[in-house]
Amino acid sequence: MRTLKSLVIVSAALLPFSATAFAADAIQEQPPVPAPVEVAPQYSWAGGYTGLYLGYGWNKAKTSTVGSIKPDDWKAGAFAGWNFQKDQIVYGVEGDAGYSWAKKSKDGLEVKQGFEGSLRARVGYDLNPVMPYLTAGIAGSQIKLNNGLDGESKFRVGWTAGAGLEAKLTDNILGRVEYRYTQYSNKNYDLAGTTVRNKLDTQDIRVGIGYKF
């Protein structure tokens, strides 16, 4: 009887410690609460933008009197456009206007380029934070021929096409590099009674910086 009484007393004394240990185990066995996952905001190319460009042009002017002349030089200007976006496809319209310092003479005939501009469609693929794209449209440029006796300047219209890569530098600042090929139609120039037929092709590499609204 005394043994049974002793067991009851010992069990009663250990009961609080057992309950505490069980409660501690229950608390420890609860699964940890997963930390919230932060989702980065999706960048959109949609909207308007504008910027400046600097480039270099490799030109080839074919003439009916002295053959080919290659007036290569720097160019600079501004561009602006508007993008639309559906999933990863980016499309829109862009225009640019600038000035080319290309000028060269051969056998007394000088070819000089001046104002140039274009209006183009553009389509790209969003690889956030960069976008490769293709572009094509119409182009125009002021081109002057001079043979030392007479000079004539004409505004020429042609077509242009190219490809580029645009990158998001910040939420609003864009950087780009672009290649363009442009061909201007044949034109006749009347230089002191001599008719000179001219065709001009240009190849440009341009780098630009822009601001997205």
From Swiss-Prot:
Major localization class: membrane
Disulfide bond entries: none
InterPro entries registered for this protein in UniProt: OMP-like (IPR051692), OMP/PagP_b-brl (IPR011250), OMP_b-brl (IPR027385)
Location(s), subcellular: Cell outer membrane
Signal sequence bounds: 1-23
One Pfam family recorded for the sequence: OMP_b-brl
Keywords: Cell outer membrane, Membrane, Signal, Transmembrane, Transmembrane beta strand
GO CC annotations on file: cell outer membrane
Domain of life, per lineage: Bacteria
Family: Belongs to the Omp25/RopB family.
Stated name of the protein: 25 kDa outer-membrane immunogenic protein
Gene: omp25
